[in-house]
Amino acid sequence: GFSLIGKRALDDPRNQLVFHYVRLVRELQPNYCVFENVPGLTVGPHQRFLRELIEAFQEAGYDVLLPYRVLNAADFRVPQDRRRLFLIGVKQGLPLPAYPAPTGRTTVAEAIDDLPDADRFQELLASDSVAVAFDTFHPYARRLRGLESDPADYSHPRSFDPDRLTSSLRTEHTELSRRRFTQTPQGKVESVSRFHKLAPHGLCNTLRAGTDSARGAFTSPRPIHYRFPRVVTVREAARLHSYPDWFRFHATKWHGFREIGNSVPPLLGRAVAGEIMKVLGCIAEKPEKPLLLGHGNESLLKFDMSEAAAYFGVPVNTIAQRTRNTAR
């Protein structure tokens, strides 16, 4: 949510993340910058906030590609109906890129049908990973699993164990909940939990982050799997967000889903970045040397915010936490 109280919305402390973004652009002076946020900024009173943001970019010496666009990740092979506003800022005097054209679509089943059912493994009640061999056939899933090369991926190849299912800590449901999940038709919303049940040949609904601890630490509703009477795992959500299987998330479900829900789907981010590469005249080459994964300190995946700040030497209050309004 954005506050619009006061003379300038950008000056309101409740809008501090956007303020810090503009501050970093001013200080770092990149040639190009990209801003992504919810499409609600383009309608109603929030348009004022958007106008102020564009003015702030212009005052910092940047042109903004107009008209701005709301892009749907589903148009860029991400199996998720996720619409987000994108602003592209360009240092004045440099060429403006275009917004990316759609590249195609992927279905839910094409993304996650190969993943083993987490409920089969007792180990996943206490740990978020387990060793298991499984077959993957669809190109989208094969690329995310590292079994097939992606000609548009210029990142370092990763050397990791594709037969280890990670980020798959189980969620325990009551038998009553499982019966309700089973009885809910695919593509519909379960009436009690209000969880959306995935349709294998459709798209996932928007994966959201939920609220932080200052606002009650509520988990955003997680989709119900189309085949199994349970909500999706973090790994399944990651596939539905276009993250590769080598990418690890926080070991807890709450933090793992927040990391995914707060992020730009990699395939959508790549499409936007690709347009900037074109105007820069970049000719990318994929590195040959793989990065070896699997030998790091996995305890880092369990850190809370204060532990992570202490470990990396970052002040924990660099961006102040929101305080709850208890006077209600």
Indicate where each model-derived feature is located:
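Class I S-adenosyl-L-methionine
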Residues: 3-188
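C-terminal target-recognition/interaction regions appended to catalytic cores
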Residues: 139-328
